[in-house]
From Swiss-Prot:
Species for this entry: Escherichia coli (strain K12)
Family per record: To H.influenzae HI_1162 and to HI_0925.
Any Pfam family matching the protein: DUF559
InterPro entries named among the record's database cross-references: DUF559 (IPR007569), Endonuclease_DUF559_bact (IPR047216), Restrct_endonuc-II-like (IPR011335)
Top-rank lineage group of the source organism: Bacteria
Coiled-coil zones: none
Protein's name in the database: Uncharacterized protein YcjD
């Protein structure tokens, strides 16, 4: 099962959506306020769109087909929160139309979850 999840994550990394690519431009290589993110990162039996493991923050992008997955996402979010993660969800059109606000919201949560020096 673990090998299957890792294989699926690898495939998803190769086939990011346009909005995932746009967001990854900011989050990759510690470009985003020096926070390290992983894309399509497996946690338990789930694959997270973007994860900052040090702050335990998950960023998920949802598209139009997403309305069909509400119950699944609710279970998934509950499980992740029980494991100490905070899950931030954004619609793809928010990345397209309001990218700066999305980035501000992510940074605000990262700063809130990170220990002060």
């Amino acid at each position: 099962m673990i090998d299957k999840i890792k294989s699926n994550a690898r495939d998803l990394r190769r086939n990011l959506t346009l909005q995932e690519r746009k967001l990854w431009r900011y989050l990759r290589s510690r470009r985003f306020s020096d926070f390290k993110f992983r894309r399509q990162h497996p946690v338990g039996s789930y694959i997270l769109d973007f994860a900052c493991c040090s702050a335990r923050v998950v960023v998920e992008l949802d598209g139009g087909q997403h309305d069909l997955a509400v119950a699944y996402d609710s279970r998934r979010t509950s499980w992740l929160e029980s494991q100490g993660w905070t899950v931030l969800r954004f619609w793809n059109n928010e990345i397209d139309c309001n990218e700066e606000t999305v980035l501000e919201n992510i940074l605000q949560e990262l700063n809130r979850r990170s220990p002060s020096p």
